[in-house]
Amino acid sequence: MSFKYILLDKKDGIATITFHRPEALNALNSEVLADLDAVVDDVIADDEVRVVVFTGEGKSFIAGADIKEMDGDTALEAIRYSRKGSAVFRKIELMDKPTIAAVNGYAFGGGFEFVLCTDIRFACSKAKFRLPEVTLGIVPGFNGTQRLPKCIGMNKAKEILFTGKMLTAADALELGILNHVTEPEQLMDEVYAMAGQIAANSASAISLVKAAVNAGSDMDIDIGKNIELGYMAACFGTPDQIEGFASFKEKRAAKFR
């Protein structure tokens, strides 16, 4: 399967999705979103894929929405575009496979919002982050006003959203937006090292851990702990649980399906 604006590579249980529109700094237009939606469906359906990595081609991760395409849109057209992007981003956030952002450059607007949808976030030291929508007279359209406060707290999020200021990778790391910052030449090596570590673990257990964490972030702990209990119990008797326990008793590395 091939796409115009997305490159897809699968190797050793890791799918790498690369935004491939460098002439526009990988800006998100309707065609990119359509390609992204299709490629995400592909990796979700592929049982051989255990981890999904997102990165960008060239000097940009995603430079935001395509302002040229949006210029002249009516309110209804803007709503349709926002709903499409929001739906794809939510699909990525909820997919049962762990996702890693490898931010190689600019992550502005929708690019920053995309990063917030992923599970683990790496960036090179030259990466920049910005939500500039208020400088354009608009509001973030891919749920940045919702995810950023949950990530770093309301007060810090409001400062970033109200000012439209630029964040360095070091800033984003300090705020808790990023997990790791690397030198540019080391970015993908470090991303793949972690992806490989995750891929070696039980895919079924990881999918349930992710579901439990996602569910618990929006509910009382007394409800969330029952969800966790149900997921934990569901693991027992599965091939991965049997293999995991056997490997522990036999003092060897587990070989999960």
Predicted regions and their residues:
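Glycine- (often His-adjacent) and acidic-residue-rich active-site loop
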Residues: 48, 56-91, 107, 220
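Well-ordered beta-strand positions
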Residues: 120, 159, 163-165, 171, ...
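C-terminal long alpha-helix characteristic of the crotonase
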Residues: 22, 122-127, 178-226, 230-239, ...
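A general structural signal for well-ordered alpha-helical segments in protein cores
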Residues: 33, 67, 85, 89, ...
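CoA-thioester-processing core
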Residues: 87-96, 102, 108-162, 175, ...
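Conserved CoA-thioester-binding segment of acyl-CoA-metabolizing enzymes
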Residues: 1-57, 90, 246
